[in-house]
Curated annotation (Swiss-Prot):
The gene is glgB. This is 1,4-alpha-glucan branching enzyme GlgB. Catalyzes the formation of the alpha-1,6-glucosidic linkages in glycogen by scission of a 1,4-alpha-linked oligosaccharide from growing alpha-1,4-glucan chains and the subsequent attachment of the oligosaccharide to the alpha-1,6 position. It holds the Pfam family Alpha-amylase_C. InterPro entries: A-amylase/branching_C, Branching_enzy, GlgB, GlgB_N, GlgB_N_E_set_prok, Glyco_hydro_13_cat_dom, Glyco_hydro_13_N, Glyco_hydro_b. CDD domains: AmyAc_Glg_BE, E_set_GBE_prok_N.
Length: 722
């Protein structure tokens, strides 16, 4: 390209390789510097020490300057602007590349697992100059520029260097707090809508959509003890009672505005810890423009939402949970992304992150786009994001949303709306390979962290290691258990005898996976009402049913999860636009449910038989699972030491069962350690107190207890040490 053509191309924002022309270069045997500064009247060159080295000639009226540069050292530009005022600027085009060749090679392979340390916007120092290093992947773009509040959002000012499809530039003087986006020209030369940074660490509050340069090192962590021991606390034999939270609607200020991350650290953390929960699960904390998506349509996967404060304040919240002994799980959405113009959709003018074929690239239910898991750089983006939350924010676990939609090519699609895989089947082989690799990387590179699958089908071995042929998750939500048992609880007690299999069926497959029992947010939205509202009977019976159900759940094999509000029997459907109905705690019935949940958590955590062998048949034993006529179930839970056991009995009718005999394996005294019918919880007070096992064989066991079963209640009994 001739010199005049190159100048015109720079001024028009069309130069294919701006670093080959702008900045310092050899020309006709001498060293020259070229710069494009729209609005500049004069430009002088200074040495690093401030000594004048000469003045550049204005060679284009739009602000292109060129001139000789004496010496080979550093230089700065002194700019006199047309409107008055003067600045001393570093020239971005004198600095070397941002990424190494090796980083680019690994990224192209899909194996640069922490590429977030290189792509995006990183405050940095180069050649003694402070600024920000920008890098973005857009392989099909003709030109990419950084635009922001530091350059009047003018894409001609800072076009980037293209290296293997990654565009990069170091901008001196740009630091934390600067707003920015990428201006991209597609292969045909058309300007696309300004794009937020896919790897951006912080973003404007909606309706603003710009990314914000941010320094993630501002928080000083104080959770070292937790991080050292978290592997044992997140292990399959540890208690795991999870409180699921939507941060925006847990509690609000009197004026209806959101609590900040720091306010949540002061209020939410002690609340969760005080109830005895071991973990909190946050609905997706990533940046999302549409609040009504609850975070499940994220645009900024690397940015905690700015609704509640800056990134360091989110770190403060996680830190506070850890110091209170509570682990943090984040919902994570690698299944799809929204079509917002500033997001990933057609990022460089092509279907870059998504499949071009809508039969593979568009989700018919949600109107969102599906990641192209077969592309190395897209897999790298997602795997790097998973590690980012575990590394940078000390997140303990990732609950992967909508896994079923990833596994099946025909998920929610009719005949002719999907494309079979290479073997003619409906399995999404690329998504399966991605999930397996993601889990291998998480478990291999983030010690003590874990993953959870929200997977609603019968796909086998979801929570089994990849070397065994599994998907590699640590845990899986037991959606079948949740649907069956809730359906059972909705039945009038007089009819439950005809649906007894719904309450027992889960034990047929309880040990096929490492299950979490989820009473999640999905069960209190979209017209389903509250958990309490789905219980039959009058008000007293509804509360009693709910208490009995919670007791049964805590006795059942599997880890525990309850969505916020369930702990005090929220009476209306969850509304993400307001806070929970905290005034209900003024009533004894709701307060009683909260006290029951706290006591269930305490019992669960203190009793190895209730959590130590959740995922093996040795941890569970039916005593009587077939008493459909009386709607009673009874079973034993055992610890690693089989002599350490708990007897759980649930009566799902409002009839007091006097003299109900239950077989037990050991003689001696037994104590009722928890009864959901306790008056402290709002119950009627039918109790057993101290019991002595009788030498009356029952249920195939040498001894038995003669119980009084309270109405609509679950009781826990265990041998009392003599």
């Amino acid at each position: 390209m001739r010199r005049e053509e190159a100048i015109r191309a720079v001024v028009a924002g069309d130069h294919p390789d701006p670093f080959s022309f702008l900045g310092p270069h050899e020309e006709a045997g001498r060293r020259v510097v070229r710069t494009f500064l729209p609005g500049a009247a004069r430009v002088r060159v200074l040495s690093a020490a401030g000594r004048p080295l000469g003045e550049l000639e204005r060679v284009h009226p739009e602000g292109f300057f060129s001139g000789p540069l004496s010496g080979n050292g550093r230089y700065r530009l002194r700019v006199l602007w047309e409107g008055g005022g003067e600045d001393e600027l570093e020239d971005p085009y004198r600095f070397p590349p941002v990424l190494s060749d090796y980083d680019l090679y690994l990224f192209g392979e899909g194996n640069n697992h922490r590429i977030y340390r290189h792509l995006g916007a990183h405050p940095a120092e180069m050649d003694g100059v402070c600024g920000t290093a920008f890098a973005v992947w857009a392989p099909n773009a003709r030109r990419v520029s950084v635009v922001g509040d530091f350059n009047l959002w003018d894409g001609r000012r800072h076009p980037m260097r293209n290296r293997n499809g990654v565009w990069e530039i170091f901008l001196p003087g740009v630091g934390p707090g600067a707003l920015y986006k990428y201006e991209i020209k597609d292969a045909g030369g058309s300007l696309l809508p300004l794009k937020a940074d896919p790897y951006g660490f912080f973003a404007e509050q909606y309706p603003g959509t710009a990314s914000i340069v941010w320094d993630l090192s501002r928080h000083r962590w104080e959770d070292g003890e937790w991080m050292e021991r978290r592997g044992s606390r997140n292990a399959p034999d540890a208690p795991m009672a999870i409180y699921e939270v939507h941060l925006g609607s847990w509690r609000r200020r009197p004026d209806g505005s959101h609590l900040t991350y720091r306010e949540l650290a002061e209020e939410l953390v002690p609340y969760v810890a005080g109830l005895g929960y071991t973990h909190v699960e946050l609905l997706p904390p990533m940046e999302h423009p549409f609040g009504g998506s609850w975070g499940y349509q994220p645009v900024g996967l690397f940015a905690p939402t700015s609704r509640f404060g800056p990134p360091e304040d989110f770190k403060h919240l996680v830190d506070a949970f850890h110091r209170a002994g509570v682990g943090v799980i984040a919902d994570w959405v690698p299944a799809h992304f929204p079509e917002d113009a500033h997001g990933l959709a057609r990022f460089d003018g092509t279907h870059l992150y998504e499949h071009a074929d809508p039969r593979k690239g568009r989700h018919p239910d949600w109107g969102t786009l599906i990641y192209n898991y077969g592309r190395n750089e897209v897999r790298n983006f997602l795997i790097s994001n998973a590690l980012f939350w575990l590394d940078e924010y000390h997140i303990d676990g990732l609950r992967v949303d909508a896994v079923a939609s990833m596994l099946y090519l025909d998920y929610s699609r009719k005949e002719g709306e999907w494309v079979p895989n290479e073997h003619g089947g409906n399995e999404n082989l690329e998504a399966i390979a991605f999930l397996r690799r993601m889990n291998e990387v998480v478990y291999g590179e983030a010690p003590g962290a874990f993953t959870v699958a929200e997977e609603s089908t019968a796909w086998p071995m979801v929570s089994r290691p990849t070397y065994m042929g599994g998907l590699g998750f640590g845990y899986k939500w037991n959606m079948g258990w949740m649907h069956d048992t809730l359906q059972y609880m909705k039945e009038d007690p007089v009819h439950r005898r005809y649906h007894h299999d719904r309450i027992t069926f889960g034990l047929l497959y309880a040990f096929n996976e490492n299950f979490i029992l989820p009473l999640s947010h999905d069960e209190v939205v979209h017209g389903k009402g509250s958990l309490l509202g789905r219980m039959p009977g009058d008000r007293w019976q509804r509360f009693a049913n709910l208490r009995a159900y919670y007791g049964f759940m805590y006795g059942h094999p599997g880890k525990q999860l309850l969505f916020m509000g369930g702990e005090f029997a929220q009476e209306r459907e969850w509304d993400s636009g307001s806070q929970l109905d905290w005034h209900l705690l003024e009533g004894g019935e709701n307060r009683g449910v909260r006290d029951l949940v706290a006591d269930l958590n305490a019992l669960y955590r203190a009793t190895p038989a209730l959590h130590q062998v959740d995922f093996e048949p040795e941890g569970f034993e039916w005593v009587e699972g077939g008493d459909a006529e009386q709607s009673v179930v009874s079973f034993l839970r055992r610890a690693r030491n089989p002599e350490d056991f708990v007897l759980v009995v649930s009566n799902f009718t409002p009839v007091v069962r006097h003299g109900y005999r239950v077989g037990v394996p050991a003689s001696g005294p037994y104590a009722e350690v928890l009864n959901t019918d306790d008056p402290r919880y709002g119950g009627s007070g039918v109790a057993n107190g101290e019991l002595e096992a009788e030498e009356v064989p029952w249920h195939g066991r040498p001894f038995s207890l003669r119980l009084t079963l309270p109405p609509l209640a679950t009781v826990f009994l265990r041998p009392r040490p003599v």
